Amino acid sequence: MLVSFEGLDGSGKTTQVERLRASLQADGREVVTAREPGGTELGEQIRALVLHGGEMTPWAEALLYAAARAELVAEVIEPALARGADVLLDRYFDSSVVYQGIGRGLGRDEVLQLNLLAVGGLVPDRTFVLAIAADRSLERVGSRPDRIEREDAAFHERVAAGYEELAALFPERVVVLDGSLDPDALAERIQGELQRVG
């Protein structure tokens, strides 16, 4: 099973990945987790460049994310799925669709196609979008902003709206949940939703 978690920075994705990992492991399942960008040596180098490096064009940013993602799929995700492990991702290609495609104005469909090529068409069984208001995201990030988080409020509003658009486009796999819920309640809703997946 491949599950991705999406949402604005500070929405609680990492917390929910860890809670789901613990729950699945308690059931005796092998679980692999990864963050994006990252998860491989090359991916971590790209992460440092895109989040903490200098300015770059929107297409350069999108292509770097896609390169990191291609490496993660080949080195980590596909081997884990092949041996029957569950894979939980703290971001996946939907992040690029909303951040670069919609937030940066490169085009939702263009960035989606780029990323589907990069991942060889590997789509999650379920994607959870943890929705929080853009101003709440910026509050939670606080004093640790990276290059993306330093964007203006209008950018973050476009990204938040982009996640809603994504859910409408792919209702069979994208589930939007209230990221302001208590983490325990949110974890229960996620586990309940995954029981329908298998």
Whereabouts are the PLM-identified features?
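A glycine- and Lys/Arg-enriched "phosphate-lid" helix/loop adjacent to the NTP-binding pocket
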Residues: 91, 96-161
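Pre-Walker A (Motif I) flank of P-loop NTPase domains
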Residues: 1-2
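Hydrophobic anchor at the beta1->P-loop junction of P-loop NTPases
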Residues: 5
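Conserved lysine of the Walker
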Residues: 13
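P-loop (Walker A) phosphate-binding loop of NTP-binding proteins
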Residues: 8
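Hydrophobic positions on the alpha1 helix immediately C-terminal to the Walker A/P-loop
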Residues: 16
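NTP-dependent small-molecule kinase module
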Residues: 21, 135-198
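ATP-dependent small-molecule kinase phosphotransfer cores
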Residues: 29-119, 189, 193
